[in-house]
């Protein structure tokens, strides 16, 4: 591979840029003569058979239920590593990001709920503006290069990881349909097997993957969202290798998945889910409760919630402002937390999966949700970048 291309792909901003380009491509195709081909592509039936078990889903659901399980596997690996040997292993490093994450979840959810309180069906989308897209937010921050203090980047990363953990819990508790006891028993047996393998010191990743596939199928059939199987699998992958100094299975798998997810799965997910039809679009549609609640939740709720809760915790003596960055820079990061994008799109697919892509006034469907997500995320990204660009130290001449 050309050295310049390799360097570009290893740039932290690469994933965010690809996700953005994929979303732009989806919107361009959806609003062109190729839109029927785009939707037909996402509706392609894909069947996989295991003995007598057949799983048949359109391609879109394979992306959302299957490939996104790989994304959540990576999230599970990162969470385990951070809690056991990373920044989250030190309680003093956790307080401020946790407080910020709580504010960044509570206020957006409250804003959305307040705006949509007259529509019970729309209330299912309350969690959509609570999410933060790690790859996109860090990608925007990476555009500012070495001007960004390490402590500021670490704060955003830690807050986003905690935000992901909250998203996992929200999906598990609030977006689970009717449960299948038989499938849950199989899933429980698979989890027990994975834990036993970990306890016995099994370090071969392939064995965990085989049992993980069984777990994914069981969770898929259980009524719990299948992506949670990825999180569970990530939690049981061993953190230590067989020999001292050897690359552990967790670190190896995390390294292997990092670029697959950031440069492949997330851009593909964005392309499959960001197609918004602009036909008949007028500014008034943004004032409909669903897109308005999501857009304001992401843009206003996130920045005020994150910054406000952090400010209160510091002023009350609960935490300290980390060395190396200022209040203005902290506010810029709070703005970047409003870039919900892929995570918000994912949660909206759970909340409004019954809806069409048509933008119907007041209807709780994917179309109106996507519009709100794109608006809130773009505004948060632009204003966050501008504020950080002017508040960070000037690069050396």
From Swiss-Prot:
GO molecular function: sodium:proton antiporter activity
Pfam family, one: Na_H_antiport_1
Membrane topology, record value: Multi-pass membrane protein
Alphabetic keyword roster: Antiport, Cell inner membrane, Cell membrane, Ion transport, Membrane, Sodium, Sodium transport, Transmembrane, Transmembrane helix, Transport
BP terms from Gene Ontology: regulation of pH
Location (main, coarse): membrane
Superkingdom field: Bacteria
Recorded family membership: Belongs to the NhaA Na(+)/H(+) (TC 2.A.33) antiporter family.
Protein name per Swiss-Prot or TrEMBL: Na(+)/H(+) antiporter NhaA 2
């Amino acid at each position: 591979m050309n050295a310049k291309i390799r360097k570009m792909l290893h740039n932290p901003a690469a994933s965010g840029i690809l996700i953005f380009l994929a979303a732009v491509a989806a919107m361009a195709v959806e609003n062109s003569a190729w839109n029927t081909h785009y939707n037909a592509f996402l509706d392609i039936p894909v069947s996989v058979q295991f003995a007598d078990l057949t799983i048949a889903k359109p391609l879109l659901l394979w992306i959302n239920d299957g490939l996104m399980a790989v994304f959540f596997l990576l999230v599970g690996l990162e969470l385990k590593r951070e809690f056991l040997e990373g920044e989250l292993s030190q309680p003093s490093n956790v307080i401020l990001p946790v407080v910020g994450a709580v504010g960044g979840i509570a206020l957006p959810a409250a804003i959305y709920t307040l705006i949509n309180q007259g529509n019970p069906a729309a209330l299912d989308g309350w969690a959509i503006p609570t999410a933060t897209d790690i790859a996109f937010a860090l990608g925007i921050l990476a555009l500012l290069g070495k001007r960004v203090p390490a402590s500021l980047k670490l704060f955003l990363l830690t807050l986003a990881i905690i935000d992901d953990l909250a998203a996992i819990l929200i999906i598990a508790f609030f977006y689970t349909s009717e449960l299948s006891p038989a499938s849950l028993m199989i899933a429980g047996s698979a989890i027990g097997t994975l834990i036993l393998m970990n306890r016995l010191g099994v370090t071969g990743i392939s064995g965990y993957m085989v049992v993980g596939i069984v777990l994914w199928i069981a969770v898929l059939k259980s009524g719990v969202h299948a992506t949670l199987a990825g999180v569970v699998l990530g939690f049981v992958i061993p953190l230590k290798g067989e020999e001292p100094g050897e690359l552990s299975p967790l670190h190896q798998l995390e390294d292997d998945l990092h670029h697959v997810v950031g440069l492949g799965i997330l851009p593909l997910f964005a392309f499959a889910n960001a197609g918004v039809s602009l036909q008949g679009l007028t500014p008034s549609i943004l004032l409909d409760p669903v897109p308005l609640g999501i857009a304001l939740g992401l843009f206003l709720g996130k920045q005020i919630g994150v910054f406000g809760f952090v400010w209160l915790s510091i002023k009350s003596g609960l935490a300290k402002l980390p060395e190396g960055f200022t209040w203005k820079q902290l506010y810029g990061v709070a703005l970047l937390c409003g870039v919900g994008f892929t995570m918000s799109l994912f949660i909206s697919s759970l909340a409004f999966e019954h809806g069409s892509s048509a933008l119907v006034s007041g209807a709780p469907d994917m179309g109106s949700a996507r519009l709100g997500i794109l608006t809130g995320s773009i505004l948060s990204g632009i204003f966050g970048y501008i504020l950080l660009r002017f508040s960070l130290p000037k690069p050396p001449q």
